[in-house]
UniProtKB/Swiss-Prot annotation:
It comes from Chloroflexus aurantiacus (strain ATCC 29366 / DSM 635 / J-10-fl). One of its GO terms (cellular component) is cytoplasm. The gene is aspS. This is Aspartate--tRNA(Asp/Asn) ligase. Homodimer. Residues 198-201 are annotated as: Aspartate.
Length: 589
């Protein structure tokens, strides 16, 4: 037996007992006759005292260094009051070692384990097995385990079945590029790794498994924007005989119970707010707004239709908008800070930023545009924005999509500068009534906003043939603190409607049959009404753990370039393997 207890287990009640511990040397302090070693495992740290009265064990302690794997036997004793360490769960006791054995020595690690170092993330990823020894990473992975376990237990109690779906599936166009797997047995043919189990879970509904879930691994060969991974984990769910409210109510109950269990110290406003897509875009410029703070967008367009200021007027005459944000108490912002905010909106596509400072002393307004307005227009803007002395008004004039994107960026930037987002608040909300399709200007066709299996709202069905852009979907997104936490919809369950949507999306009958024939045929054998959702596990745990990226809550993530620095994947393969697969590599010139 290597150990009788873990390094986080011993308490004053164990005093006088002979125990055996095994773990890693966290810290070592040599005081000559006395050597103190903090022995660590994932359960905690225990201070071990090596006294020269036990010379064999003391000699072992003289040789060990950080991260040696050590087994120690000895007697538990109470620490003197002045030596109690309140930062350790085991801080009231220590182990007086009588025997010790080095189970494995260790080279000097390239990263500090005992404390957070300033090393580059690439070093952490290359030596991830060392990085994972750190308290922060252990805490994150334990939290992840608790989240997944809670979900499994909750859904089991709700009558759901956890059913695994295949990893090797048919390649179908669902948005991002598929990861392809060549078939040795069928030369020239390929499997795909699933971007999601979307079609398979719908087929499970046809099969009669009315409550399905899976902790699903998903794969997308897309350009790695910001904080994405080529492989990720989602809670995949589907239910039969449900409408939108049924799905939303279940998920809200589950996430409320989850958060109150695993992060009880966080504030969780309930019930979750519900915003239509149109309302979210109008008020926040985003379909995933952070609702922990205000800074809402204010539409000024109707006040400026006749304005002599040509910048605003030209935008409005071309179908654009003029919108602004009131930054309360920010009249003290310097010109340099305002220039930085201008760069923020330019990153969102805006050509510039109009601004006005309302001084606190009742003095003259400073503004980049007020002098160009007609009498009364600036006063109308101040009134509409409910501005007060000491406020900073920030305005963008452009096409609606640019106004939304630029003011969304500005809103988030201001919130960060002003520290408006409480890190201990979890602000969930539902975004509903998404458009079913959006026009792709480059390819001159309609694209599905979510995916082609999303059902249109019944009351909008008559618009499919005449005005598809106005058709709303039975789709919903769960948002959390400015992130999309999960997306779902009520699905199409009739072949004729599914074919109508395929046709609208420019998918011919021949292509639909080739790509989705199995789905269309299944719908002819009594497919029930059904719907589901797929919250992302990585993103959820990231937010609950207060981490900046999903890489911090994944055991072995890849870089933004989709490279595994630890194993050097992807890597070349043996020519013999390629030959067996009937594949020849043609490198780009």
């Amino acid at each position: 037996m290597y150990r009788s207890h873990t390094c986080g287990e011993l308490r004053p009640a164990h005093a006088g007992q002979e125990v055996t511990l095994a773990g890693w040397v966290h810290r070592r302090r040599d005081h000559g006759d006395l050597i103190f070693i903090d022995l660590r495992d994932r359960y905690g740290i225990t201070q071990v005292v090596f006294n020269s009265a036990h010379p064999t064990a003391h000699e072992v302690a003289e040789t060990v260094r950080s991260e040696y794997v050590l087994q120690v036997r000895g007697k538990v004793r109470i620490r003197p009051p002045e030596a109690v360490n309140p930062d350790l769960a085991t801080g009231e006791i220590e182990l007086e070692a009588s025997e010790a054995q080095v189970l494995n020595p260790a080279r000097t690690p390239p990263i500090y384990i005992a404390k957070e170092g300033g090393e580059d993330e690439s070093v952490r990823l290359k030596y991830r097995y060392l990085d994972l020894r750190r308290e922060r990473m252990q805490r994150n992975l334990i939290l992840r385990h608790r989240v997944v376990k809670f979900i499994r237990d909750f859904l089991d109690a709700e009558g759901f079945l956890e059913i695994e779906t295949p990893i090797l599936i048919k390649s179908t166009p669902e948005g991002a590029r598929d990861y392809l797997v060549p078939s040795r047995l069928h030369p020239g043919k390929f499997y795909a790794l699933p971007q999601s189990p979307q079609q398979l879970k719908q087929l499970l509904m046809v099969a009669g498994y009315d409550k399905y879930f899976q902790i699903a691994r998903c794969f997308r060969d897309e350009d790695q924007r910001a904080d994405r991974q080529p492989e990720f984990t989602q809670l995949d769910m589907e239910m039969s005989f449900v409408d939108q409210d049924d799905v939303l109510d279940l998920i809200e109950r589950m996430f409320t119970a989850l958060c109150r269990t695993v992060v009880p110290h966080k504030h969780l406003p309930t019930p979750f707010r519900r915003l239509s897509y149109a309302e979210a875009m109008e008020r926040y410029g985003s379909d995933k707004p952070d609702l922990r703070y205000g800074l809402e967008l204010v539409n000024l367009s109707d006040l400026l239709i006749e304005t002599p200021f040509q910048v605003f007027r030209n935008v409005l005459n071309s179908g654009g908008q003029v919108k602004g944000i009131r930054a309360p108490g920010c009249a003290h912002f310097s010109r340099k800070q305002i220039d930085e905010l201008t760069d923020v909106v330019r990153a969102g596509g805006a050509k510039g930023l109009a601004w006005a400072v309302l001084p606190t002393d009742g003095g003259e307004v400073r503004s980049s545009f007020a002098k160009n307005l007609a009498p009364g227009e600036f006063a109308a803007i101040v009134e509409r924005m409910q501005a007060e002395a000491g406020d900073l008004l920030l305005i963008v004039a452009d096409q609606p999509a640019v106004v939304a994107a630029s003011l969304d960026k500005l809103r988030r930037n201001l919130a960060e500068r002003l520290q408006l987002a409480d890190p201990n608040t979890l602000c969930f909300a539902w975004i509903v009534d998404f458009p079913l399709v959006e026009w792709n200007e480059d390819e001159q066709r309609w694209d599905a906003v979510h995916h082609p299996f999303t059902a249109p709202k019944d009351e909008d069905m008559h618009l499919l043939a005449t005005d598809p852009g106005k058709v709303r979907a039975k789709a919903y997104d769960l948002i959390l603190n400015g992130y999309e936490a999960g997306g779902g919809s009520i699905r199409i369950h009739r072949r004729d409607v599914q074919q109508q949507i395929f046709s609208l999306l420019g998918i011919s009958e021949e292509l639909a049959q080739a790509q989705f024939g199995h789905m269309l045929e299944a719908f002819e054998y009594g497919a029930p009404p059904h719907g589901g959702i797929a919250p992302g596990i990585d993103r959820l745990v990231m937010i609950l753990a207060d981490e900046p990226t999903i890489r911090e809550v994944m055991a072995f993530p890849k870089t933004q370039q989709a490279v595994d620095l630890m194993t050097n994947a992807p890597s070349p393969v043996d020519e013999r393997q390629l030959k067996e697969l009937h594949i020849r590599i043609v490198m780009p010139e």
